[in-house]
Amino acid sequence: MNNKKNLLIIAGLAILAIIVIIIVANLGNRQAGPVSQSGEEIRIAPTDLDRETPIATPEEVMQAKPVIEGTSKVLDNVVVTPTGKPVKNDVRPGSPEAPQQTAPVNPETLPSDSVKLTGSAAGFSPDRFEVKAGQLVTLSLTSVDDMTHVLLFADPELSAVAIGVGPNETRAITFNAPKAGEYPFHCDVPGHLSRGEKGVMVVN
């Protein structure tokens, strides 16, 4: 009787040990990242990528998907060009190496974790937002009046991250946030900055 009880205890302990090993192995493989206010994991990429070397094969790029239709594709949380190289945030907007903005989109189709800005004669709203260094950011701009608005960052490091919208139009762009710091942005339409169309992106 005691032998049977001892065998059951040993078998139970062995099963428990196997379960613990499996759980620990799974936790070790999971790459946990920061979590947004909505509870979704924030997607982070290294900020020191070699932007001249492809990080994907042509086949992998074909399989990659954009966060929203019309923006550049994303592979392993890195925004990439059609040739598989990480995009450059410091080139001319709209160039092949730059992150691409969408055509006009329905704002209701934007991902829930997008940074959604509106632009009007009253300025940008919100005029300040925070992201993490390397974070995959989808930034949208909606004109809520009958004017054109062009969001540009002052820092040349982000010269390619630009969104231009027509009256009552929404467009978006996806990019990886730069290193930590404060990055002012403004509306580049003549006269709009002087009336207060400006803001700041804070990268932590």
Model regions and ranges:
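Beta-strand-rich interaction surfaces with strong enrichment in secreted/lumenal proteins
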Residues: 126-129, 159-165, 173-174
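N-terminal edge beta-strand
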Residues: 106-136
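Extracellular/periplasmic metallocenter environments
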Residues: 21, 35-36, 41-110, 166-204
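Membrane interfacial helix-start segments of signal peptides and signal-anchor transmembrane helices
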Residues: 1-20
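Non-cytosolic beta-sheet module surface loops
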Residues: 121, 141-143, 177, 191
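Exposed beta-strand and adjacent loop surfaces of beta-rich binding modules
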Residues: 114, 136, 148-150, 182
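Sec-dependent signal peptide cleavage junction
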Residues: 23-34
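Histidine- and aromatic-enriched segments that form or immediately flank copper-ligand environments
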Residues: 144-167, 194
